[in-house]
């Protein structure tokens, strides 16, 4: 029986969870931290707000957002991998944060009422979901009017030379890193496949608009190795 994308991705993240944080730093040369910081600076996150971090994984972005909004705010992190959440909960406890809740759930059907959150974030997760548009629509639904979505993910450089280097790195080098650092060649081969199939920056911006978002914009990081897309839910008239 053919394995669905959702089943395959779930199996990948359940297996690589113990080494995920270390591999993230190895694969991106620790640039993922810089990309998040650049994104949050542009978001202008307000204190005391309510945040949803979709596909939160091991809670890196959940923790950064919790520190930014302060103790009066609240962050809910959601992921479908219990093993990733287990690592995330340990990190939240270690950081002594009391305004973060990590829950098991599916990004395709967010278990929240409409208009619940001031900010929704998703970092390196959208490319792994079965239906990009369904998840974009769900994130739009749970945003409050005036709320903001920020999505960081890998992208596809257009700079001649760098594009070829980037593609070769993801296709051939990254799985080898996975084999030697995490004993997971097969799983890291899947991650490069999901990166290769993910829409480019301009197309993803169009999808944001199709999902209902306004004032959509995006920035590229590190020559297009990744990109952040921003979108807002219009305030009710």
Curated annotation (Swiss-Prot):
Record's keyword annotation contains Transferase: yes
Molecular-function GO term, any one: demethylmenaquinone methyltransferase activity
GO terms classed as biological process: menaquinone biosynthetic process; methylation
Keywords: Menaquinone biosynthesis, Methyltransferase, S-adenosyl-L-methionine, Transferase
InterPro entries assigned: MenG_heptapren, SAM-dependent_MTases_sf, UbiE/COQ5_MeTrFase, UbiE/COQ5_MeTrFase_CS
Positions that bind S-adenosyl-L-methionine: 58, 79, 106-107
This protein's record includes keyword Methyltransferase: yes
Pathway connected to this protein: Quinol/quinone metabolism; menaquinone biosynthesis; menaquinol from 1,4-dihydroxy-2-naphthoate: step 2/2
Catalytic reaction annotation: a 2-demethylmenaquinol + S-adenosyl-L-methionine = a menaquinol + S-adenosyl-L-homocysteine + H(+)
Enzyme Commission no: 2.1.1.163
Function: Methyltransferase required for the conversion of demethylmenaquinol (DMKH2) to menaquinol (MKH2).
Family named by the database record: Belongs to the class I-like SAM-binding methyltransferase superfamily. MenG/UbiE family.
Listed PANTHER family: 2-METHOXY-6-POLYPRENYL-1,4-BENZOQUINOL METHYLASE, MITOCHONDRIAL, METHYLTRANSFERASE
NCBIfam families reported for this sequence: MenG_heptapren (TIGR02752), MenG_MenH_UbiE (TIGR01934), PRK00216.1-4 (NF001243), PRK00216.1-5 (NF001244)
Protein name: Demethylmenaquinone methyltransferase
Organism: Listeria monocytogenes serotype 4a (strain HCC23)
């Amino acid at each position: 029986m053919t394995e669905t994308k959702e089943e395959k991705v779930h199996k990948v993240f359940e297996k690589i969870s113990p080494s995920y944080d270390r591999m993230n730093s190895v694969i991106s040369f620790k640039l993922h931290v810089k990309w998040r910081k650049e994104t949050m600076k542009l978001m202008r996150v307000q204190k005391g707000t309510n945040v949803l971090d979709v596909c939160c994984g091991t809670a890196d972005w959940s923790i950064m957002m919790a520190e930014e909004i302060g103790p009066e705010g609240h962050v809910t992190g959601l992921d479908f991998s219990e093993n990733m959440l287990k690592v995330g909960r340990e990190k939240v406890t270690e950081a002594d944060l009391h305004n973060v809740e990590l829950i098991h759930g599916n990004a395709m059907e967010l278990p929240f009422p409409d208009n619940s959150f001031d900010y929704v974030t998703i970092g390196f997760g959208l490319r792994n979901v079965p239906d990009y548009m369904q998840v974009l629509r769900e994130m739009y639904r749970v945003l409050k009017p005036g709320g903001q979505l920020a999505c960081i993910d890998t992208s596809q450089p257009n700079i001649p030379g760098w594009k070829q280097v980037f593609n070769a790195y993801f296709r051939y080098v990254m799985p080898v890193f996975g084999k030697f650092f995490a004993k997971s060649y097969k799983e890291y081969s899947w991650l490069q496949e999901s990166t290769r199939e993910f829409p480019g920056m301009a197309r993803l911006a169009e999808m944001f608009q199709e999902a209902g978002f306004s004032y959509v914009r995006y920035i590229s990081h590190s020559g297009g190795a990744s990109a952040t897309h921003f979108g807002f839910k219009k305030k009710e008239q």
